[in-house]
């Protein structure tokens, strides 16, 4: 590439896309600065010189956020960026998924792709710029890579598709789709939607692919100008004679073992065959490298046989038809003290979801590069090792768990009631208790049931299903409800969630170079059929959301005040609102428009807090009568509390019809007085009169007589 700076530009969805090479990060194998509008992302690709002694492709993709990109200084004492945000982790996964299938089988050199977000224009996606830059950094480098790929965001406003919609357009859009692929095929889809029909989702994907082709042509132009010659990489290969020997020893027995229907029995049967073959090689005293290759050959034989049975004989490992769903069952209300719970079981995959309702003050505060500051609906996914019958450390959530949690959140968010209709913060936690594939989709089903059990008035129930694919040449088979082995050995994991009306979320990962429209269409239609079957099973357990909330859930009372009165409720340094909270034990959340949410498990305390607030914001009206209480006595008169927080002065001359020499001769502290408001002066001071009330009473009595 040399040291000379090169600049390339095109128009991308009405904004300028500029690529700079040759100036920054020149010691990386490949580096590009991508500028999209005012968004700037530096993407680099680096590879180790020698292959690693591992049995997988060691690729790492990092999307690094820097708060200086939006003019922020990190909070806390350290003032540095800490662990990656959830958004950064999801963006890293988004970039990883379309580039991973485009490295050769047997690639064992470590590859690291890093994108640092240096400037953010909120209307020009930094994730899409980073995906473009990651592909291009690999393509201009000397690292063997079968790209390029590109990705775009697709929205739909007023039934028209939009490439890379602005934030304002996304607010109105019923689709938020990210699609990536090569110039020939699609290899990654990630989407959220408002119950959009499958046909429209497919059109959106294909619409995005047309723009991808243009971006790839732009990358190819840049590579032709500044790309490095690709280096020779030693790929991991297995000796062909050894392969034939192992096949002869194991193939027939593996065929029988693979077709054992129950997961653990099948795994044990396969392990037994593998161990017998390995034992024979160990007797012959082969070296470690040979034994490692024997293990790899055995794993490949299992993979090949599973794939052959599915494509040629339409036989799945557990004996199901290609479009058959595993046995379904569900249950609600398992945990008495939680606000709602749902258990969903599909074959040997089981998820228990718990719904917790909180006040609006319990929202998650977000501190990142986006404009969104808080989140009132959350879905968290946990995958403990016991769910697959294994041991392991209990750590915090990893990338996979965060990704699955976000997918469930995206699938369920469209059916969550608005803050106006249901002023609660909602947190769902899905605990995977058993795993044999499709756990993320089981968590969506369980979470729907948990919300219904909690009494959340959802717009419609959502179910999810994972579709698979086994493709050999032009022959392919689409599988409904894939289990773990089919996910591991197949070519696609296509997760589809939605209601009876349409799709709310999609996620597609593939291990081959890409998929045609025909396969996508078949997978979506087969998924719809499966989703309807699952929804029917779920609704037989609980047909609709419960009418009452759990007695342990907070009760929320909503009231509105004049926004100008908010300061009276809060008081100086929060003194007033803190006193209300201390006296009643409630939580209080105040919106800028004067809407106040009061929450507590005790409804009487909500009402008490409401009464205090009403008194604080109540307006004193001139000419009105009030029954007040004497709070303070001075030589010049008595101060009377009309209601909480509102005092007025009855001057000594206004205490009685006759002349009063001493205030204490007429009233004492604690006395109740009926008084009339005669004036509110420019400083807001309230002047009261008892004399005026007595005069009116006297006149009425005289009229009667």
Swiss-Prot record:
Single GO molecular-function term? polyribonucleotide nucleotidyltransferase activity
- What Enzyme Commission number(s) does the record list for this chain? 2.7.7.8
Keyword terms, alphabetized: Cytoplasm, Magnesium, Metal-binding, Nucleotidyltransferase, RNA-binding, Transferase
Q: Which Gene3D superfamilies match?
A: GHMP Kinase, N-terminal domain, K Homology domain, type 1, Nucleic acid-binding proteins
**Record's subcellular location:** Cytoplasm
Origin superkingdom:
Bacteria
GO cellular-component term (any): cytosol
The processes (GO biological process) annotated in the record are: mRNA catabolic process; RNA processing
- The enzyme's main class, written as a single word, is transferase
**In this protein, which residues make up the domain named KH?**
554-613
Q: Which reaction does it catalyse?
A: RNA(n+1) + phosphate = RNA(n) + a ribonucleoside 5'-diphosphate
InterPro entries membership: ExoRNase_PH_dom1, ExoRNase_PH_dom2, ExoRNase_PH_dom2_sf, KH_dom, KH_dom_type_1, KH_dom_type_1_sf, NA-bd_OB-fold, PNPase
What Pfam families does UniProt report for this protein, alphabetically? KH_1, PNPase, RNase_PH, RNase_PH_C, S1
Where does the S1 motif domain start and stop, copy by copy? Answer: 623-691
Q: Which cofactor does it need?
A: Mg(2+)
Summarize where Mg(2+) binds, as residue positions: 487, 493
Q: What protein family does this chain belong to?
A: Belongs to the polyribonucleotide nucleotidyltransferase family.
Q: What does this protein do?
A: Involved in mRNA degradation. Catalyzes the phosphorolysis of single-stranded polyribonucleotides processively in the 3'- to 5'-direction.
What name appears for this protein in its UniProt entry? Answer: Polyribonucleotide nucleotidyltransferase
């Amino acid at each position: 590439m040399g040291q000379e700076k090169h600049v390339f530009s095109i128009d991308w969805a009405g904004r300028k896309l500029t690529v700079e090479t040759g100036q920054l990060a020149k010691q990386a194998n490949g580096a590009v600065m991508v500028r999209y509008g005012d968004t700037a992302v530096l993407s680099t690709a680096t590879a180790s010189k020698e292959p690693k002694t591992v049995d997988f492709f060691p690729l790492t993709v990092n999307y690094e956020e820097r708060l200086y990109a939006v003019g922020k200084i990190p909070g806390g004492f350290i003032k540095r960026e800490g662990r990656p945000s959830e958004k950064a982790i999801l963006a890293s996964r988004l970039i990883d998924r379309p580039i991973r299938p485009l490295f050769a089988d047997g690639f064992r050199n470590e590859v690291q792709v890093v994108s640092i977000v240096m400037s953010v224009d909120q209307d020009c996606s930094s994730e899409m710029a980073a995906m473009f830059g990651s592909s291009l950094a690999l393509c201009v480098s000397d690292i063997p890579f079968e790209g390029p790929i590109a990705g775009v965001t697709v929205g739909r406003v007023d039934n028209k598709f939009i490439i890379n919609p602005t934030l304002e357009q996304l607010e109105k859009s019923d689709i938020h789709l990210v699609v990536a692929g090569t110039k020939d095929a699609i290899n990654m889809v990630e989407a959220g939607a408002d119950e959009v029909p499958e046909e429209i989702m497919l059109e959106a994907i294909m619409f995005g692919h047309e723009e991808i082709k243009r971006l790839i042509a732009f990358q190819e132009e840049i590579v032709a100008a500044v790309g490095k010659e690709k280096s020779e990489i030693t790929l991991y290969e297995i000796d062909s004679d050894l392969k034939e020997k192992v096949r002869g020893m194991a193939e027939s027995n593996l065929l029988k073992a693979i077709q054992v229907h129950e997961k653990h029995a099948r795994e044990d049967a396969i392990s037994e065959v593998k161990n017998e073959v390995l034992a024979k090689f160990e007797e012959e005293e082969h070296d470690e490298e040979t034994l490692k290759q024997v293990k790899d050959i055995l794993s490949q034989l299992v993979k090949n046989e599973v794939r052959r049975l599915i494509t040629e004989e339409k036989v799945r490992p557990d004996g199901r038809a290609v479009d058959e769903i595993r046995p379904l069952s569900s249950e609600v209300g398992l945990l008495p003290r939680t606000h709602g719970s749902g258990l969903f079981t599909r074959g040997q995959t089981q998820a228990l979801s718990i719904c917790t309702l909180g006040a609006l003050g319990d929202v998650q505060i977000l501190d990142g590069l986006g404009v969104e500051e808080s989140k009132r609906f959350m879905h968290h996914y946990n995958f403990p090792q016991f769910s697959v019958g294994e041991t392991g450390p209990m750590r915090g959530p990893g990338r996979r768990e965060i990704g699955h949690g976000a997918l469930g959140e995206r699938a369920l968010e469209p059916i969550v009631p608005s803050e106006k209709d249901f002023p609660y913060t909602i947190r769902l936690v899905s605990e995977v208790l058993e795993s044999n594939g499709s756990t993320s989709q089981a968590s969506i089903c369980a979470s729907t049931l948990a919300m219904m059990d909690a009494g959340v008035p959802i717009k419609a129930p959502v179910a999810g299903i994972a579709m698979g694919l086994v493709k050999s040449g032009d022959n392919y088979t689409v599988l409904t409800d894939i289990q773990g082995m089919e996910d591991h050995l197949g070519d696609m994991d296509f997760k589809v969630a939605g209601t009876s009306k349409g799709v709310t979320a999609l996620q597609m990962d593939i291990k081959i170079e890409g998929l045609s429209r025909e396969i996508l269409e078949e997978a979506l239609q087969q998924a719809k059929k499966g989703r309807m079957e699952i929804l029917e099973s779920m609704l037989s357990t609980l047909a609709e959301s419960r009418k009452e909330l759990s007695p342990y859930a907070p009760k929320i009372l909503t009231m509105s005040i004049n926004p100008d009165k908010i300061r009276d409720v809060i008081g100086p340094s929060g003194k007033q609102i803190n006193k209300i909270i201390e006296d009643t034990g409630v939580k209080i959340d105040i919106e800028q428009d004067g809407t106040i949410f009061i929450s507590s498990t005790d409804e009487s305390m909500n009402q008490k807090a409401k009464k205090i607030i009403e008194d604080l914001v109540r307006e004193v009206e001139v000419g009105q009568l009030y029954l007040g209480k004497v709070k303070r006595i001075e030589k010049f008169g008595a101060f009377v509390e009309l209601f909480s927080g509102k005092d007025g002065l009855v001057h000594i001359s206004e205490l009685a019809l006759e002349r009063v020499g001493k205030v204490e001769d007429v009233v004492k502290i604690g006395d109740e007085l009926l008084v009339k408001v005669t004036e509110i002066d420019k400083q807001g001071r309230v002047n009261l009169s008892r004399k005026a009330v007595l005069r009116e009473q006297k006149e009425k009595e005289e009229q009667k007589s």
